[in-house]
Regions:
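Gram-negative bacterial Sec-dependent N-terminal signal peptides
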Residues: 1-22
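Conserved aromatic anchor
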Residues: 47-51, 157-192
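Recognizes extended acidic, P/S/T-rich segments that occur
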Residues: 64-106, 178-241
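Ligand-binding face of N-terminal immunoglobulin V-set domains in extracellular IgSF glycoproteins
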Residues: 95-126
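Surface-exposed beta-loop interaction hotspot
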Residues: 111-116, 120, 129-165, 169
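Extracellular Ig-like/FN3 beta-sandwich strand-entry sites
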Residues: 119-123, 227, 241-247
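Short beta-strand elements
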Residues: 134-149, 258-279
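Beta-strand-rich modules
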Residues: 235-268
């Protein structure tokens, strides 16, 4: 789920945001955020964070129990250049036993329950130090309020549409999520978690190294939008040949920036021949 390197063409109207976009200043830091991101289609889950400070030599994050979960120190030329914005994401293991996955991936499954047991909700402390030992501090909240996965993704050649879901796709179905709420593992069922915004992405599925691979359309729209659809500019679609394989992603972004994405394979500029089925 490398959506943080997307390039949004200048011709595309809207804002290309990322799931790790902090929503407010963070004390001494310009931004800081810790969040959970789920891909409901692939069925994987990860921890992401972002911090943005000024002229730092080192940066660190402690969880609500005071356990250090991340530390970074500048060395050599980076010590001269300094640290400012730091973003990272954990490995994203499968959260279900996917029968089509590699054997190694199936051995490393981390269920939703396992993941929530590993991480502690609450206040995460971000700290950084500069040349003279001056200290920057900021706090952000990690919650287990996980928005439900979008469903019914469609692309008609120019418009991407979707609907509101009620579970986490391959990571957990509705009934299992209800059990986790009743057991006190989850504070709220995902179907009841408010969506602050929807992140919508269209990207081609081309060979590695193909320049077209960086031409990705990304936009965010308000979570309370009544009409859940986005029109993709024709100027963007004109960059691709007929029958170019691609995919669309729609992410439900919660108030604490936790995000759940769903993706679907599509055919860009499809004609009567359609895209070849690689399967």
């Amino acid at each position: 789920m490398k959506r943080y390197t997307r390039i949004l063409l200048a011709l595309v109207l809207g804002t290309g945001a990322t799931a790790a976009m902090a929503t407010e200043p963070c004390d001494d830091f310009g931004e800081c955020k810790a969040l959970i991101e789920i891909n409901s289609t692939d069925g994987d889950i990860g921890f992401h964070f972002l911090m943005d400070g000024d002229d730092l030599n080192s940066a660190r994050i402690d969880d609500p129990d005071g356990v250090k979960v991340f530390e970074d120190k500048a060395k050599g030329p980076l010590m001269e250049q300094k640290l400012t914005e730091t973003f990272a994401e954990s490995a994203e293991p499968l959260c279900w036993d996917d029968p089509d996955a590699d054997e190694e991936d199936r051995e490393d499954v981390v269920t939703l329950e396992d993941f929530l047991e590993l991480w502690t909700p609450g206040t995460y402390l971000f700290t950084g130090k500069g040349d003279e030992g001056e200290k920057s501090e900021g706090e952000t909240e990690l919650t287990f309020n996980l928005p439900a996965a979008p469903i019914d993704l469609e692309f008609d050649g120019s418009v991407i549409s979707w609907d509101v879901g009620d579970d986490l796709g391959n990571c957990a179905d509705y009934d299992r999520l209800m059990d986790l709420v009743n057991e006190g593992v989850l504070p709220t069922h995902p179907e009841a978690v408010d969506v602050d915004s929807w992140e919508v992405v269209l990207e081609p599925d081309v060979e590695d190294g193909d320049p077209l691979g960086s031409l990705k359309f990304t936009i965010r729209v308000a979570g309370d939008t009544g009409l859940k659809e986005v029109t993709v500019p024709m100027e963007y679609l004109a960059y691709f040949d007929d029958n170019t394989p691609g995919k669309i992603e729609v992410g439900a972004i919660g108030g604490e920036d936790n995000a759940t994405f769903t993706e679907v394979e599509i055919c860009i500029n499809e004609d009567v021949e359609g895209c070849e089925d690689e399967d």
